[in-house]
From Swiss-Prot:
It comes from the Eukaryota. SUPFAM superfamilies: PetG subunit of the cytochrome b6f complex. One of its GO terms (molecular function) is electron transporter, transferring electrons within cytochrome b6/f complex of photosystem II activity. The lineage of its organism: Eukaryota, Sar, Stramenopiles, Ochrophyta, Bacillariophyta. Keywords: Chloroplast, Electron transport, Membrane, Photosynthesis, Plastid, Thylakoid, Transmembrane, Transmembrane helix, Transport. It comes from Phaeodactylum tricornutum (strain CCAP 1055/1). This is Cytochrome b6-f complex subunit 5. Signal peptide: none annotated.
Amino acid sequence: MVEPLLSGIVLGLITVSALGLFVAAFLQYRRGNQFEI
């Protein structure tokens, strides 16, 4: 009964971390473009 909960938590952490990395990279990319312009 614990495995579904654990797998759900792991999937949630992976999704959130991936989303966070994507947002950070996007913000850094935009900031770099603003500096160039």
